Amino acid sequence: MNTQVWRVCVGVMLFCFVGRIGCAEEKMVREEGLAVADGIYAVMETNRGTIVLSLFFEKAPLTVCNFVGLAEGTLAVCKGRPFYQGLTFHRVIKDFMIQGGDPQGNGTGGPGYQFPDECDPALRHDSPGVLSMANAGPGTNGSQFFITHVATPWLDGKHTVFGKVVEGMEVVHAIIAGDTIRSLKIVRRGAAAKRFVCDQAQFDQLRKRVSAASK
């Protein structure tokens, strides 16, 4: 094999190798959500497609700890089981929001406990794609959440905003009542996100702190 042919073969092999690496990286990014900034993200796979949510763990740590702990099965109530997997969006109101996270599937269920609100004035229901906690009044948060279709400012101060859609608003708009959460994967990027623990001890500590601050 002459030198020129050898160089061509090596070039083709290198191109294919780099291409495979690029495809693997793209697949990993798709599986983990996006090539995004540091933070904690929830990649929600539904029967309509994927919704990627940025979680505001620094401004609503208790609420995010609860959501992530349920999603990953690290809270005592889950016993190692991903809580949200297989649950439905039981309530959908056009031009308002989609609501899910109820193990009963009818709006009456929850994880078996409640925790206080974290209504940071900087976090508002000011746009489509806001992730917020459903409740039955102050201090009744559990596992149910909703994602807005539009801005809903009348909910400010009444429901805890703890995240926002960064990809998949078209999926949010396509969801209908009865659609399913097939999986909910948590992705951590950056040192602060990786230090954010979401186990039962951390949840209990945060709940105690937020409860004391609200008195």
Curated annotation (Swiss-Prot):
It is an enzyme of class 5 (isomerase). Its EC number is 5.2.1.8. GO terms for molecular function: peptidyl-prolyl cis-trans isomerase activity. InterPro entries: Cyclophilin-like_dom_sf (IPR029000), Cyclophilin-type_PPIase_CS (IPR020892), Cyclophilin-type_PPIase_dom (IPR002130), Cyclophilin_A-like (IPR044666). GO terms for biological process: protein folding. It catalyses: [protein]-peptidylproline (omega=180) = [protein]-peptidylproline (omega=0). It holds the Pfam family Pro_isomerase. Residues 38-197 form the PPIase cyclophilin-type domain. CDD domains: cyclophilin (cd00317). Keywords: Isomerase, Rotamase. It comes from the Bacteria. Belongs to the cyclophilin-type PPIase family. PPIases accelerate the folding of proteins. It catalyzes the cis-trans isomerization of proline imidic peptide bonds in oligopeptides. PANTHER family: PEPTIDYL-PROLYL CIS-TRANS ISOMERASE-RELATED, PEPTIDYLPROLYL ISOMERASE DOMAIN AND WD REPEAT-CONTAINING PROTEIN 1. This is Probable peptidyl-prolyl cis-trans isomerase. It comes from Treponema pallidum (strain Nichols). The lineage of its organism: Bacteria, Pseudomonadati, Spirochaetota, Spirochaetia, Spirochaetales.
